[in-house]
UniProtKB/Swiss-Prot annotation:
The gene is yhdK. Keywords: Cell membrane, Membrane, Repressor, Transcription, Transcription regulation, Transmembrane, Transmembrane helix. Pfam families: Sigma_M_inh (PF17453). Interacts specifically with YhdL, while the N-terminus of YhdL interacts with sigma-M. Its main location: membrane. Induction: Cotranscribed with sigma-M and yhdL. YhdK and YhdL negatively regulate sigma-M. GO terms for cellular component: plasma membrane. This is Probable anti-sigma-M factor YhdK. InterPro entries: YhdK (IPR020496). Signal peptide: none annotated. It is a multi-pass membrane protein. The chain crosses the membrane at residues 12-34, 38-60, 67-86. It comes from Bacillus subtilis (strain 168). It is found in: Cell membrane. It comes from the Bacteria.
Length: 96
């Protein structure tokens, strides 16, 4: 029960989500600067896996947390950007 209290008080899941989003954004910048699609493919699983952490944080704190919401928004932004970059670079039609 102590671990649950620590996770709840310190927004652990929200900060994990935000940290993953920041790392994904840095990798996204690297992919754009170097013009290599491979980096985009590497970052996508991290951004997709971090979204549930932010959602869990929102449910734990009942929507009163900044890191959880920020993590969800940033990771969804990363996922949309990655799909756009990959679809443009590889001439795939993802609907963008």
């Amino acid at each position: 029960m102590e671990l649950v209290r620590i996770f709840k008080e310190h927004n652990v899941f929200g900060w994990i989500s935000v940290g993953t989003a920041v790392l994904s954004l840095l990798l996204l910048n690297l992919a754009i600067i170097s013009n290599v699609t491979f980096y985009s493919y590497q970052m996508l699983p991290f951004a997709m896996a971090a979204v549930p952490f932010g959602v869990v944080e929102l449910f734990i704190k009942r929507g009163r947390t900044g890191p959880g919401l920020l993590g969800v928004i940033l990771n969804l932004f990363v996922i949309i950007c990655v799909y756009t970059i990959v679809s443009v670079d590889t001439n795939l039609q993802f609907g963008f």
